Amino acid sequence: MAVAKKRKVKKNIPEGIVYIYSTFNNTIVTISDKQGNVVSWCSAGVLGFKGSRKSTPFAAQNALADAAKKAADCGMRKVEVKVKGPGPGREAALRALVSTGFEVSRIYDVTPVPHNGCKPPKRRRV
């Protein structure tokens, strides 16, 4: 006898947190509820951008739009935004979030800043 397949229960999550982690090579977007449970996530690499195309603002915009669509299916409308990292996708991802129709309540910059910790990598000579 075959095992009965469980139906996926549709969650109703009205508020959440959007984490935008933007590095020089990629942009990763994670959307969670207020408790920190991940609702959806996406990155530029998952969408098929490879190599230097992952670090473009356009790739970050598409990554956020994809993650936001999945979160909107769960009923999410109001979000807080936490942005981390110095990458080129920061502002593009924020603009994409506003255009998807989410109500943004707060924007935090949580980029870690060292209090003179580790020595940074040496300058590139090309």
Swiss-Prot record:
Coiled coil: none annotated. It comes from the Bacteria. The keyword tRNA-binding does not apply. Belongs to the universal ribosomal protein uS11 family. GO terms for biological process: translation. InterPro entries: Ribosomal_uS11, Ribosomal_uS11_bac-type, Ribosomal_uS11_CS, Ribosomal_uS11_sf. Keywords: Ribonucleoprotein, Ribosomal protein, RNA-binding, rRNA-binding. HAMAP family: Ribosomal_uS11. This is Small ribosomal subunit protein uS11. GO terms for molecular function: rRNA binding; structural constituent of ribosome. It comes from Desulfotalea psychrophila (strain LSv54 / DSM 12343). NCBIfam families: PRK05309.1, uS11_bact. Part of the 30S ribosomal subunit. Interacts with proteins S7 and S18. Binds to IF-3. Located on the platform of the 30S subunit, it bridges several disparate RNA helices of the 16S rRNA. Forms part of the Shine-Dalgarno cleft in the 70S ribosome. Transmembrane segments: none annotated. One of its GO terms (cellular component) is ribosome. The lineage of its organism: Bacteria, Pseudomonadati, Thermodesulfobacteriota, Desulfobulbia, Desulfobulbales. It holds the Pfam family Ribosomal_S11.
